[in-house]
């Protein structure tokens, strides 16, 4: 069996076109453009690349982005003050904190200061709780983007045995909630799960997010499985690979996401979708 590629780059571009059309329609009716505020603390080069990509995506669809760069010496109180200003700024529909933060800062405290209706990353406890209660509002971007991809390819998730490898707050945990909403039977594992191979061999849908290059060998993949690889890892030779050994998994899976070009573009476009959703809600209540 040769897998069909789930092309996140293609799907994300199609979604951007629809968002741009909606933004133009809103502005032609006299409304302002949606606004996204991004807060970058320190000078992490990888974080700077991610912020640049998000700014570019905003420009492509007509959103206005506001970048606030704080020094690595910034205190939590200084960040709280900035967030409070943005919470009360009617030009701003979405606020994101570019992660990771410097170690001295308490990530949970910082994220909790964002108004839940502007939390377009979907990490505020209120939004996570809504997802857990089966009534999501602003949903975490990567997990929502994966669901969008699967739906785009008309993959019926109902009653599939889904195995999630990785239990982070950013991917694994919200992904589990999304899969339960879709009607999957879900097994949640991580890098240190005993007999991990057995779980993966029985997975109809496998979602891997551990941040370790080629961690899952293709020989573990069930014939005809759907493989979603969230990992993005740079090898010593400069090549970018995922958490699943692609070439061998490609020969066994029915569907598979490439790295790069699979989940990554969907995370960014989902951030834009969430910002437009927050914008629509802003105008609805006013």
Curated annotation (Swiss-Prot):
What family does this chain come from, according to its entry? Answer: Belongs to the tetrahydrofolate dehydrogenase/cyclohydrolase family.
UniProt lists the gene as folD
Q: In which pathway does it act?
A: One-carbon metabolism; tetrahydrofolate interconversion
Q: Does the keyword NADP belong to this entry?
A: yes
Keywords, A to Z, come to: Amino-acid biosynthesis, Histidine biosynthesis, Hydrolase, Methionine biosynthesis, Multifunctional enzyme, NADP, One-carbon metabolism, Oxidoreductase, Purine biosynthesis
A single GO BP: L-histidine biosynthetic process
> What is the name of the protein in this document?
Bifunctional protein FolD
Q: Which InterPro entries match?
A: Aminoacid_DH-like_N_sf, NAD(P)-bd_dom_sf, THF_DH/CycHdrlase, THF_DH/CycHdrlase_cat_dom, THF_DH/CycHdrlase_CS, THF_DH/CycHdrlase_NAD-bd_dom
């Amino acid at each position: 069996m040769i897998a069909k590629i789930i092309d996140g780059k293609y799907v994300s571009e199609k979604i951007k076109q629809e968002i741009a059309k909606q933004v133009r329609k809103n502005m032609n009716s006299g409304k302002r453009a949606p606004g996204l505020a991004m807060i970058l603390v320190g000078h992490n080069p990888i974080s700077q690349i991610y912020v640049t990509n998000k700014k570019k995506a905003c420009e492509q669809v007509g959103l206005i982005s506001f970048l606030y760069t704080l020094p690595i010496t910034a205190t939590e109180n200084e960040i709280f003050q900035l967030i409070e200003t943005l919470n009360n700024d009617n030009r701003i529909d979405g606020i994101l904190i570019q992660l990771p933060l410097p170690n001295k800062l308490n990530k949970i405290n910082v994220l909790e200061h964002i108004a839940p209706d502007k939390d377009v990353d979907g990490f505020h406890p209120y939004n996570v709780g809504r997802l857990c209660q089966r009534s999501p509002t602003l949903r975490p971007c990567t997990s929502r983007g994966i669901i969008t991809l699967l739906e785009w390819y008309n993959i019926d998730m109902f009653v599939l045995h889904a195995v999630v490898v990785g239990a982070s707050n950013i991917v694994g945990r919200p992904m589990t909630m999304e899969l339960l909403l879709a009607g999957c039977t879900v097994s949640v594992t991580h890098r240190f799960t005993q007999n991990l191979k057995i779980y993966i061999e029985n997975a109809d849908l496998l979602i891997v997010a551990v941040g370790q290059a080629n961690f899952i060998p293709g020989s573990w993949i069930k014939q005809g499985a759907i493989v979603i690889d969230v990992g993005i890892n740079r090898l010593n030779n400069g090549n970018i690979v995922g958490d699943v050994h692609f070439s061998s998994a490609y020969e066994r899976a029915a569907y598979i996401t490439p790295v790069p070009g699979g989940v990554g573009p969907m995370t960014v476009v989902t951030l834009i979708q969430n910002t437009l959703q927050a914008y629509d809600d802003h105008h609805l209540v006013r």
